[in-house]
């Protein structure tokens, strides 16, 4: 009853894709902190591209815009502490 000869189930991972390459109408802008928050952890760290699935070009743009938004206090440098 095993699905494969070794007894392990096969796990298929969905390929990550860059949502900005797929939909060119999505802007990456520091003035829109709601869209940038999806690329920041709850502790305030920028999510790496291997986790977020963005391409290198758009990851650099996201990082640049997050840093700009932090400079003018639209996004926090540090997340909320665990209490």
Swiss-Prot record:
One of its GO terms (molecular function) is small ribosomal subunit rRNA binding. Pfam families: Ribosomal_S18 (PF01084). The keyword Repeat does not apply. The keyword Ribonucleoprotein applies. Belongs to the bacterial ribosomal protein bS18 family. GO terms for biological process: translation. It comes from Desulfosudis oleivorans (strain DSM 6200 / JCM 39069 / Hxd3) (Desulfococcus oleovorans). Binds as a heterodimer with protein bS6 to the central domain of the 16S rRNA, where it helps stabilize the platform of the 30S subunit. Part of the 30S ribosomal subunit. Forms a tight heterodimer with protein bS6. GO terms for cellular component: cytosolic small ribosomal subunit. This is Small ribosomal subunit protein bS18. The lineage of its organism: Bacteria, Pseudomonadati, Thermodesulfobacteriota, Desulfobacteria, Desulfobacterales. Keywords: Ribonucleoprotein, Ribosomal protein, RNA-binding, rRNA-binding. Gene3D superfamilies: Ribosomal protein S18.
């Amino acid at each position: 009853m095993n699905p494969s000869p070794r007894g392990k189930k096969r796990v298929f991972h969905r390929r990550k894709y860059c949502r900005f390459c797929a939909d060119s109408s999505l802007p990456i802008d520091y003035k829109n902190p709601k869209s940038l928050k999806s690329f920041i952890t709850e502790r305030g760290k920028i999510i790496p591209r291997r986790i977020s699935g963005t391409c290198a070009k758009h990851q650099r743009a996201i990082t640049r815009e997050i840093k700009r938004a932090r400079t003018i206090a639209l996004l926090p440098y540090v997340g909320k502490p665990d209490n």
